[in-house]
Design a protein with these regions (language model features):
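Generic structural motif
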Residues: 12-15, 209, 268
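N-terminal structural segment of carbohydrate-active enzymes
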Residues: 1-95, 110-113, 204
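Active-site-proximal loop/turn and secondary-structure-junction residues that shape catalytic pockets
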Residues: 45, 102-106, 175, 182-190, ...
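Core domains of carbohydrate- and sulfate-ester-processing enzymes
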Residues: 118-195
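Active-site-proximal helices and loops of the catalytic beta/alpha 8
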Residues: 2-4, 23-30, 50-56, 61, ...
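Short, mixed-charge, low-aromatic patches
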Residues: 33-43, 168-178, 197-207
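Residue-level detector of flexible, active-site-proximal loop/helix-junction positions
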Residues: 67, 163, 268
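Active-site-adjacent "subsite" loops/lids of carbohydrate-active enzymes
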Residues: 125, 154, 177-220, 225, ...
Length: 269
């Protein structure tokens, strides 16, 4: 087997000029000449604003196509420019890999009221309050997309944690209460901070069947729409590993075993 070389084709402090996809398309042949076999691209989804690197993901179905969060383009450009960059990479024999952020959602459209307990940030298994109601940013309506591609709306019960109580204007880590709610099982996420299911924003609850169904639907749509040939999975130490194994298995069964998947797992060990 010929040695392969993957390149991370972005860094945190790129200019927010919307030209990154165009630059990548123009650079494709040069990368191939250098011997690059795989290119890891930054998150292509609509995030909190046009300057967001992409990890504050808002709408997985908006690749820089709809006027949402004050912008049509993402930090990197428009949907058609993203698709063109992918096609240019494939034409010169480079495998394009998408950065996929499935741990959380940010910048919800509406507040909702629901019950939580506050937990210790240093040990998320330790509750430090009795149950109480907060107003949290958990209702995602995606009005700018107007139900194109997918009509799912996210509500508080699709998440298991959030980090801000608008009612009291107070940040914290709030474990959402309700039937079958709670962090992922301790043996299915990293044990840093007791249970590291929660990282930031509104944390997806992979015990909820509607969440799983929507993410599977998104993956089918995304690969068909873009033609990417691999995923870099963000923040896998924070995501239920039972879901993640099944998700990767499903993608490979549909796209072929050569579909390249790797994950980010930061650990001090």
């Amino acid at each position: 087997m010929t040695n392969q070389t993957a390149m991370q084709y972005f860094e945190w402090y790129l200019p927010s000029d919307g030209q990154h996809w165009n630059n990548l398309a123009d650079d494709a042949q040069h990368l191939a000449d250098l011997g690059i076999s795989h290119v890891w691209m930054p998150p292509a989804f609509k995030a909190t604003n046009k300057d967001d690197v992409g990890y504050g993901v808002y709408d997985l179905f908006d690749l820089g196509e709809f006027d949402q969060k004050g912008t049509v383009r993402t930090k990197y450009g428009l949907k058609e420019e993203y698709l063109n960059a992918i096609n240019q990479l494939k034409e010169v024999g480079i495998v394009p890999m998408a950065d996929v952020v499935l741990n959380h959602k940010a910048a919800a459209d509406k507040l909702e009221t629901f019950e939580v307990v506050e937990v210790d940030p240093e040990d998320r298994t330790q509750e430090i309050s009795e149950p109480f109601e907060i107003e949290g940013w958990t209702h995602f309506t995606f009005d700018g997309r107007n139900k194109a591609y997918n009509d799912f709306e996210w509500h508080w019960y699709h998440f298991n944690g959030t980090d801000f109580d608008a009612k009291r204007n107070k940040s914290g880590i709030y474990l959402i209460q309700g039937d079958n709610k709670g962090w992922a099982d301790n043996d299915l996420v990293d044990n840093e901070n007791g249970n590291f299911d929660y990282l930031m924003y509104a944390n997806l609850d992979y015990k909820h069947p509607e969440v799983i169904e929507n993410i599977y639907e998104w993956a089918d749509w995304f690969v068909e729409t873009t033609g990417v040939q691999g995923f870099r999975m963000d923040a896998v130490k924070h995501i239920d590993s039972f879901f993640m194994r099944n998700f990767i298995r499903d993608v490979k069964e549909k796209q072929g075993q050569d579909f390249y998947v790797f994950g980010e797992f930061w650990n001090g060990n």
